[in-house]
């Protein structure tokens, strides 16, 4: 990033996150726009012999994260070289996407207090798109994972008298089936 000519680099945000800033030809608008990419190394061995192979045994940038990071470095190089925009570009290199906590940890560490961006654009590869094209959408575009906890509590009973109790296992099974069918039967997975 230093070689790209960015104006500032702050590392250690959320422990291992990094943010680079690039000022446009003018900053009169005061706008700050974020570009974000994930940069997780995953705990798996890399069994290839490429020049860019991971230097850390048992860790590799799988799942396209190396591509995401490379795209954001490419954006940094272009934006720093041209500066053909008004405001400040904030390049967010986010760790911990796979663990679902990297963004939260960066925010808790003051990411948006230090860099009060008006909008953020996430970058993600999409192998089925034609090379050299960009996919855009108004609103949500990619799927996301989330975790929920549902606790089922009921009046227990004896196995010989199930009619006198509420079978929490059966209730939980029905909830599981109903929640699974929301996406599988009622919504498109990409909505």
Q: How would you name each of these model-derived features?
A:
Residues 1-61, 70-85:
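Acidic/His- and Gly-rich active-site-bordering loop/insert found
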